[in-house]
Amino acid sequence: MSDPVFFQFSTATVIILLVLFYGGTFLLSTFVNEKEESVDGFMVSSGKVGFGISAASMTATWIWAASFYGAAISGYNYGLSGPMHYGFWGALMILFIYPFGLRFRALAPNAHTLAEVMHARHGSGSQLILAVSNLMGSVISLMVNFTAAGALVAVLSPLSFQAGVLIAGIGVLSYTLWSGFRASILTDFAQVVAMMSIAVVIIPWVYFSAGGSEALQAGYDIITEEQADFFSMTAILEQGAPFFVAVLAYAIGNQTIAQRLFAVRQDLIKPTFITATLGYGSIVIGLGMLGLMALMLGIVPHEGDPNNIIPQMASAYLPPVMIALFFVLVIGSLSSTADSDLSALAAIMMTDIYGRNLAKGNPNPRKMLLLGRLTMIVATMAGLILASFALDILVMLVFVGALWGAIVFPVIASCYWNRVTNQAFIWAVLGGLLLFTVVRFELLPMTGVVAGFFEIVAAVGGGVVVGLMAFGFFGRIAGIAVGVIGMAVGIFYFSGFLREYTVLLGSLTAYGASTIICVLLSLLGKEEFDFDVINERVTSFDDDAALAAVRAADQKI
């Protein structure tokens, strides 16, 4: 089957849709504008956000446009199991973070960023490593969302890819700039309600318009045996396992998640994250089925670009009114995450770069707000420039997630184990990144002893991943037991095998190397940290007493 003819809106129609969406979102954000904005309100809504807003914001932030595109690409490439590998593991990682989130919040109820907690635990070195990695991740996330906007506009209108990228960037910045995080979570609520309502209609509409079960049944004749297998090992090793490992790192290393963790009321963390888990999984798996349908209908991605699969399916099988709703759906999803990234970047620059370092214990709230808004402007420009390269979304997701993998164990261990030192944290992250880079870019030939070494390190990483999950939900003994078993199984099965799957090998190597280095250096040290002092060192920026406490804490560190 050849590509169906695209339906395209006129330039005027697309501009009207974008103006209505971003104009309406801007008006909605004015309800939370304050003439004299507070620093804590701008960054985390003073830690008092309720259940409904928090759950919706968490869901909307995790459901970004890349979720739609990535899930569809996965379904198109890997068949029956593709959407499940993307949506299920992504949902599981939202659930995974809440037990650790309870610990982070208990240690530092007034925190603004996770890097700020690391500053109180270790000092500036560890804080800046986490902060810089978060900055890089959020800028790349902006790029991914703006890329999705450009792809959508280019397929559904006469406007260019660059025009779509530019409009999305300016639109998101317009309603986030003044009120920051408070504007982000309020608009998230409206966006997630709209996304869920539209998705429930669009998915079955495409299904029946494409011919329903009869058309898809015929598609079994044109897909491969691996694509027809729900338990395909190719899909597990090339998509499921790498993405599972990557999103685990996202859950810990992404400031947009931490920001909502520190914003929601402390007693509502668990129900908020459970609700977001269910919301994310159901929507993303459903939308990923569009990629599976495209595969079984024999559709070829427009111009060979897999990012075009979802807009291509929508334009081929939906009537104009539904295409307009689909357009709003994707624009809403990318905007809800892009505004979260801007708020996250602002919080990192305000707290971790200025508040805890450049200000030398004497931060000026007005300067912090100005810096936060300037950061949003600069970050938007950077995201727009990077988006112009139109890189593959799924590749970027796996790469950034694996990059953050080196941070996961040192961060979690620092919040539970009093022996972890600043040097152990720093060298663990640097070592993990170095070995990940060697594997991912094949700087050394993955053969013989070299490959065997990395497979052993990756086996340790696999044990760490499953061990941390067990530890979060069932405690230390279960975590250690599951981790050791996971390592043993990994050493047995990975030997001579995992070297063929570079993405997964690199991701697990980052976990394993950072864990080994962190544990060894911590055991060699003699430090025994008192976790009670974290709460004393992490304070609000909104009153004089808190600022005095910040100065005193910084002097201690």
Question: What do the PLM-derived regions correspond to, one by one?
Answer:
Residues 1-557:
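Membrane-embedded helix-loop-helix hairpins and adjacent transmembrane boundary segments
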